[in-house]
Amino acid sequence: MAAGKFASLPRNMPVNHQFPLASSMDLLSSRSPLAEHRPDAYQDVSIHGTLPRKKKGPPPIRSCDDFSHMGTLPHSKSPRQNSPVTQDGIQESPWQDRHGETFTFRDPHLLDPTVEYVKFSKERHIMDRTPEKLKKELEEELLLSSEDLRSHAWYHGRIPRQVSENLVQRDGDFLVRDSLSSPGNFVLTCQWKNLAQHFKINRTVLRLSEAYSRVQYQFEMESFDSIPGLVRCYVGNRRPISQQSGAIIFQPINRTVPLRCLEEHYGTSPGQAREGSLTKGRPDVAKRLSLTMGGVQAREQNLPRGNLLRNKEKSGSQPACLDHMQDRRALSLKAHQSESYLPIGCKLPPQSSGVDTSPCPNSPVFRTGSEPALSPAVVRRVSSDARAGEALRGSDSQLCPKPPPKPCKVPFLKVPSSPSAWLNSEANYCELNPAFATGCGRGAKLPSCAQGSHTELLTAKQNEAPGPRNSGVNYLILDDDDRERPWEPAAAQMEKGQWDKGEFVTPLLETVSSFRPNEFESKFLPPENKPLETAMLKRAKELFTNNDPKVIAQHVLSMDCRVARILGVSEEMRRNMGVSSGLELITLPHGHQLRLDIIERHNTMAIGIAVDILGCTGTLEDRAATLSKIIQVAVELKDSMGDLYSFSALMKALEMPQITRLEKTWTALRHQYTQTAILYEKQLKPFSKLLHEGRESTCVPPNNVSVPLLMPLVTLMERQAVTFEGTDMWEKNDQSCEIMLNHLATARFMAEAADSYRMNAERILAGFQPDEEMNEICKTEFQMRLLWGSKGAQVNQTERYEKFNQILTALSRKLEPPPVKQAEL
């Protein structure tokens, strides 16, 4: 624009003197401008290329006196000191005008101010001509989520302190800005009693665990999870921000331009923002962007991590703006000269005589996105111990080795280390080829291709020769020796005759439940019975009340070990399962039916315990005694038996909403069985919480556990098939992902240590003689027939649980009716 308007004017003037701007009349006059015009008698230069006009009155000292506009004829004023670095640098000095405005100019060791000013004028001219675009961008910011700070107009981003003070004019006005002296923090600026005040918003990090933390914000008293919530509280309640100042905020000062414009207007680094701040209502005086490498580097280093505006310019294969071409070219040149600017994530291959390296292109546009392999001769190597976000230190051609990387400070989830049982070959899973394993005995050898090199293996695969693997993953192939191979059956299993002649038998996929209520022969129940028969409920309650809690726990443990296939597993069952224990089977895909059976028994037991409490037709004291007995059985299951599976079922029954709402019953328990109530509150409930958070290894010795906690694992694996009263409590926790990882790691340990659980159960049940009647009421089939009847026991699990949940709610309200207001609602 300037080149077209002033192309006819001379441009070969000397530049070693400082000249003022002259008007268009001076160009036509033959008189010397020194006699009539003073250097301080002109206003600011217009940013649209028009010529300056003469100003009447006392002449202020302005920044436009220090440089000349492109295309104007300069007139000499006085000799100028030559700088050793540049011929036309500007003297750096702040000046005060009559309004107290502070103007700070650039470093003298920069480029020509004329070129920079024209560039700034063009950008400002383009920005001024697109108000609709800025308005639309501002509306998009304000339509973000209410918890996003950018969606609130009273947030002004990184504006200087002086600018924020000028924006608040009346008592109660406020805005929130970024702290320039403490990046990452926020400051609330307000006016109270005709005085601008600044309050730093205290930021506190609450570390919940090693991997999770929560950030809270506060002034003096109450803390909030977000800054918008803090502002809403103080504005809505007219609460003083501090007791000392008594400042109250109620009138927000809203921004009228997007945050991007404010950021470009004032700069991003604290030092630059203070030097180039716009003061006292002069939005047309903007900080000039530096074209030097130091300015570009400073802006890049001081950007916040979440700044998406700057990331747009750094990504992709094309430059974001052609105006910054020289900046990027200088940055590219610096990057090639200094090792500290090596791109993260790639290595420069060492130069050798055998590899020709092509020179870098002369184009200033360079790629900052993905880097394709330009030459097949250059081999890209990736270090195995590389960390995400680790900067490279020098090229590979250096003689000195790189120092070891610093440990990562970001917390991450750690999987518990596997026990020594994982090193045993019997505990490892292997990939079996039925066609190959069928013809191989104990002494059979692998084909020669399997013992040779990878090339021979590929050759055999092309010839369709059978191999020991089906997948395309390459495994290490061991030489022929006396050690056991992972694809061969274990020696101990071979001696027991699990597989005849070493042949592989495909595991049996079970599709029918092991619980058959209609085929169950009971001493108490007729062939066909109705649900919740009163006589059967009383008989089961008498057996439960008259037996010792430890005896009841032993019967429950014995039945759990058979259902989970920890004890009483025959050779035929092992052959059908493909593994030796049900604890390992529930982690495998074909263990679907066993997982359903485990869920069935757990939920049926919990419902049965709840019915034992709610179905009592006796007095309040009888219900309190039943509660006490159940808590004692839970203690025995936890301490003596090590049966965490049934322990969780009893705790689930006690924590049902239909049970916890019985305030009179729990009060009677505390009065009559104080020690039992304390034991439940202080020991059982915290222990149950630790179990469901996957931290049982910290409070339970492994050698004391006979049946581990199974429900979190089987519930996760069968979530689409079975649901009971929504998700579990641990899944609603803030640390649910870490808890799930703990449960999955525990499942791996269960599969590895299945033999240890079996030996613990055999040791605990040694010499145990079960009672026939007590043993029957502990069976799942009896409980299903008692609760749902002979016909209802065949209905789908989900439907049965939903209907019985309504029955439990009705029984609970019958024992202790809700208040009248709740009943009316």
UniProtKB/Swiss-Prot annotation:
Record domain SH2: where: 154-253
Site (described: Required for interaction with NEDD9): 748
MF GO annotations: guanyl-nucleotide exchange factor activity; kinase binding; phosphotyrosine residue binding
PANTHER family linked to this entry: BREAST CANCER ANTI-ESTROGEN RESISTANCE PROTEIN 3, BREAST CANCER ANTI-ESTROGEN RESISTANCE PROTEIN 3 HOMOLOG-LIKE PROTEIN
Subunit structure: Part of a complex comprised of PTPRA, BCAR1, BCAR3 (via SH2 domain) and SRC; the formation of the complex is dependent on integrin mediated-tyrosine phosphorylation of PTPRA. Within the complex, interacts (via SH2 domain) with PTPRA (when phosphorylated on 'Tyr-798'). Interacts (via Ras-GEF domain) with BCAR1. Interacts (via Ras-GEF domain) with NEDD9. Interacts with PTK2/FAK1. Interacts with PTPN1. Interacts (via SH2 domain) with EGFR (when tyrosine-phosphorylated).
UniProt cross-references to CDD domains, sorted A to Z: RasGEF, SH2_BCAR3
Region of interest (Disordered), residue spans: 40-106
Entry protein name: Breast cancer anti-estrogen resistance protein 3
Keyword Acetylation annotated: yes
Gene3D superfamilies: Ras guanine-nucleotide exchange factors catalytic domain, SH2 domain
Gene: BCAR3
Bias (Polar residues) ranges: 79-94
Residues bearing PTM Phosphoserine: 32, 78, 83, 182, 290, 358, 363, 375, 471
PTM description: Phosphorylated on tyrosine residues.
Pfam families for the chain: RasGEF, SH2
Species for this entry: Homo sapiens (Human)
Positions where N-acetylalanine occurs in the chain: 2
